[in-house]
Regions:
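A short, solvent-exposed, low-complexity linear motif enriched for acidic/polar residues
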Residues: 1-203
Length: 203
């Protein structure tokens, strides 16, 4: 996955609104192979929590990520086919063809969809820098990235002289979604954003 912007959200934020976001991105972000990294090993350095404002309390993190994800995976009986990629704006949410053979590396896309606040109030489509935002819970065919919010396991208040350790646990078990069925009879493979648990220690 490619993360291009990381922001912390102050107390009062919700899953659908990042209050007074502060940009803590390191450089231009980073690409991380999260599925192959062993526990406790650094996948990429994407944020500097030292950029947070002292004395402020933060309860959510907001991440801007590319819709394109390079994945080798399976959904039901349908597997990613090497070199058979999805797209930003094609029909069926930009889904890719799969096959029942050996899973290979393919580029899948987080799908485009019209407003769905029941399931996706934590995200909206955007550009790489988190600008040109789509409406809440909407990803447009032209959006190259999406912005997503996640609650911290506990509030974070930066203190002078403190260097917190930030743990991000990624669950990629549902990284591939089959749009219509699991027996691979149609074009239906899409990327599903990984579930992330964020813990900050050493405050």
């Amino acid at each position: 996955i490619t993360m291009t912007k990381i922001e912390l959200c102050e107390t009062g934020s919700t899953i659908s609104n990042c209050l007074n976001p502060i940009n803590i991105t390191t450089g231009n972000g980073a690409t991380a192979d999260i599925a192959s990294v062993e526990a406790g090993v650094t996948a990429a350095t994407v944020a500097d929590f030292g950029k947070a404002t002292l004395g402020k309390t933060y309860t959510y993190i907001q991440t801007t990520m590319s819709r394109a994800m390079t994945i080798t995976g399976t959904a039901g009986d349908c597997k990613t086919e090497a070199g058979t990629n999805g797209s930003l704006g094609a029909a069926a949410g930009g889904a890719a063809d799969g096959h029942t053979g050996t899973a290979g590396s393919a580029i899948l896309y987080v799908p485009h969809f019209t407003q769905d606040t029941a399931n996706y109030s934590m995200m909206e489509g955007s550009n790489a820098d988190g600008s040109s935002l789509a409406s809440l819970a909407t990803v447009r065919t032209t959006d190259t990235h999406f912005r997503s919010r996640q609650i911290l396991t506990s509030p974070y208040t930066p203190v002078a002289g403190s260097s917190p350790t930030v743990f991000l646990a990624f669950d990629t078990s549902v990284a591939v979604k089959e749009l219509d069925d699991d027996d691979c009879t149609d074009a239906g493979l899409q990327a599903a954003p990984p579930t992330v648990t964020i813990t900050i220690q050493g405050q």
